[in-house]
UniProtKB/Swiss-Prot annotation:
Mg(2+) binds at residue 69. DNA binds at residues 294, 313, 318. Residues 4-184 are annotated as: Large ATPase domain (RuvB-L). Residues 185-255 are annotated as: Small ATPAse domain (RuvB-S). GO terms for biological process: DNA recombination; DNA repair. GO terms for cellular component: cytoplasm; Holliday junction resolvase complex. Coiled coil: none annotated. It comes from Shewanella oneidensis (strain ATCC 700550 / JCM 31522 / CIP 106686 / LMG 19005 / NCIMB 14063 / MR-1). This is Holliday junction branch migration complex subunit RuvB. It is found in: Cytoplasm. Residues 258-334 are annotated as: Head domain (RuvB-H). Disulfide bonds: none annotated. InterPro entries: AAA+_ATPase, AAA_lid_4, DNA_helicase_Holl-junc_RuvB, P-loop_NTPase, RuvB-like_N, RuvB_C, WH-like_DNA-bd_sf, WH_DNA-bd_sf.
Amino acid sequence: MIEADRLIQPQLQGQDDVIDRAMRPKLLDEYTGQDDTRAQLKVFIQAAKNREEALDHMLIYGPPGLGKTTLAMIVANEMGVNIKSTSGPVLEKAGDLAALLTNLEAGDVLFIDEIHRLSPVVEEILYPAMEDYQLDIMIGEGPAARSIKLDLPPFTLVGATTRAGALTSPLRARFGIPLRLEFYNVKDLSTIVTRSAQVMGLAIDSEGATEIAKRSRGTPRIANRLLRRVRDYAEVQHDGAVTQNVAELALNLLDVDGEGFDYMDRKLLLAIIDKFMGGPVGLDNLAAAIGEERETIEDVLEPFLIQQGFIQRTPRGRIATARAYVHFGMIKPE
């Protein structure tokens, strides 16, 4: 598996979570990008505050690293309530979820990351909690077992997932506010890089921030990670300030090219072009050709390449587009 080794992977790695927490915006007005989502949230939050009600349950979905956890924390801050965070795989038993729910206060936010990985038993407990603010608990065992209902204070469940399609229909239907996060444009990412540099006390000019943004694959988490590595380079090889030239030299040294591709991205594209004459090629053959698991190709490598128009996924297999050929200085055969 390659995820642990890639500087440009969108999933959390190493100290990302600790460092990202210091750079996270706290309020919607500080949040950059996702304009439609931000506009919707402003309306929903203000309406809930005017009615003095808990915000409706919210599902935030999209590729990793785009700010789902950050948005959940912003929602809690804007509503002026507490937030309790957990993740789907951690909630193994119904009692795990019950313990969290019974400790919530009125209006609090319960954030469940990777909510698509909830076990069926835990999910069943969640339904009445979301719909009626009630908790069904079984007391005793065998013939003497009986069910009791506990009333819960009104709360907001914020679920986050990279795979909205993996949620069961009953669970998905209980979220009143679905929000999809999209990849960021270079302008918004550049603003994020500049803000993060200020938090770090790092001198950076607009061209340097833009250069990092262009190679960040539309993902703030990657942008912040690259910024930290560029800072290391600037401090050791230059005077500590990040300019476009310093950013280019640092990112080239890190093997992250102008499109944000690393060695594995280029290896995948060149395999389709050179070994399979541009495609179409099936996923199993492609996985064997580059020595990777098919799941890694599908979940880690492909999404960004498809989104940027370098690969087409067809019923017959993967095809390298004309843009992929141009990236390597080639012309696609007719």
